[in-house]
């Protein structure tokens, strides 16, 4: 019996359509219900959770299979096997781009120009921490829940 975890949010509708096309309709009592079912004897449990959490839960063995973004697999450093890219993912339609951006009036032209202790805001703090560490830059990494660019230069340097 398989335990599945499917993404809530931007990948939700397309994931449900993918399952529908495979004659495995995902059914839940309301759009805010986190438990669902699929009428198939091979599938025992279906949960709908944030994509950020899915790789961790799959790597811990709480679920057998999950659908999430590659960005969250990398961010969480989860030990999972990626079986492929889905045609509706942002990797294929609107890729996530992680960039280092500074204020227009900044003297920095490259990461090497950033001063020790630079304040960096990111939706991917672990990937960002690794990126700066690999380049020998000591940075104060802060989690951002979106609109990271709006935090420069007052709340963060980049």
Q: What are these regions, as identified by a protein language model?
A:
Residues 1-158:
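Domain-level signature for soluble enzymes in the chorismate/prephenate branch of the shikimate pathway
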